[in-house]
Structures are given as C-alpha cells and as structure tokens.
C-alpha cells in the first residue's frame, strides 16, 4: 500500500516534468517588430497611435501560464487617442499589480508621474493592465497581460 501511495504522489510530478513549455523572450527598442505589437494588440485589445515607439518587450512562455509585458512611448498629442482604448473606458481604476516586466532594466513603473492605472478582466481567464504616465517628459505606457 505505501508503494501505491508513493506512485500516486509521484505521477503528477513526473507528468509536470514532461510538459513542454515555451521560451522567455526579451526584446528592446528596434528589436521589437510589428509582429510583437500586433500580438499585444490582439491579446489586450489595445490599439496604439501612429508613431508609438517600442521600448521593451518581455514574453514569459516558460511557465504554465503565458504572460507578457510591453513598454511603449506614446507620441505627444496622442494621449487622448490612446485613452479611448476599452481598458481605459471600462477597466477598473487600480494600481498595476502583475508587473511581469519588473525584473527588466527598462521597467521603471514606479518613476512615472501623472499616471493613470487601469486593469481589465478579459474573456477566457485573461487579464490586462495598463499604466500611462510621464517619464522623462514623455508619455509612456506600461502594459501587462497574463493568461490564467
């Protein structure tokens, strides 16, 4: 009987060890292509104004649940356009809590001034957060997304 019990406990661990998870990907600046921006738009529902510049992208695919973070610079004069996104219109106004990118050198969320924090529960167990604020005189958005 103890051997059967041991096998019952070990089986899930062995099974988890056999699962094939993805890779973690970090891109900075010009390494971030339209492909990543389209991915973020599709996952979060965000649309970015023309002239938006990518600063940092981190996709965490090595865990059980995928997650990503993105930092972009929003052109001066397009802040109101960006604020028309659903997450700002219908999301909960509360401080960002996921911060998948917080271990990245480009993730400086705590330095933002005049910030607007929102989050939104998405269909099928997905969740997005966005924080918009001023960083070194520029409008910057920090976006986190996770699938649970």
Tell me what each language-model feature is:
Residues 2-12:
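Sec-dependent signal peptide recognition
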Residues 10, 38, 80:
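Short glycine-/small-residue-rich flexible loop motifs, especially phosphate/cofactor-binding loops
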Residues 15-17:
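C-terminal motif of bacterial Sec signal peptides marking the signal peptidase cleavage site
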Residues 19-21:
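Bacterial signal peptide processing site
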Residues 26-55:
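N-terminal "mature-domain start" segment
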Residues 40, 66, 124-126:
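Residues that act as N-cap/strand-start positions at coil-to-secondary-structure junctions
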Residues 47-51, 55-114:
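Mature extracytoplasmic domains of secretory-pathway proteins
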Residues 92, 100-148:
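An acidic-aromatic pocket/loop used at catalytic or ligand-binding sites
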């Amino acid at each position: 009987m103890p051997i059967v019990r041991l096998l019952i406990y070990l089986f899930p661990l062995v099974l988890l060890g056999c699962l094939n998870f993805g890779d973690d990907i970090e891109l900075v600046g010009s390494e971030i292509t339209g492909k990543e921006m389209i991915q973020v738009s599709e996952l979060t529902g965000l649309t970015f104004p023309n002239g938006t510049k990518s600063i940092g992208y981190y996709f965490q695919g090595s865990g059980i649940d995928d997650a990503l973070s993105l930092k972009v610079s929003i052109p001066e004069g397009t802040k109101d356009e960006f604020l028309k996104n659903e997450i700002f219109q219908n999301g909960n106004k509360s401080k960002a809590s996921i911060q998948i990118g917080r271990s990245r050198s480009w993730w400086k969320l705590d330095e933002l001034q005049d910030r607007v924090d929102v989050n939104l529960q998405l269909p099928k167990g997905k969740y997005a957060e966005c924080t918009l604020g001023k960083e070194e005189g520029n409008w910057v958005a920090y976006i986190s997304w996770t699938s649970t």
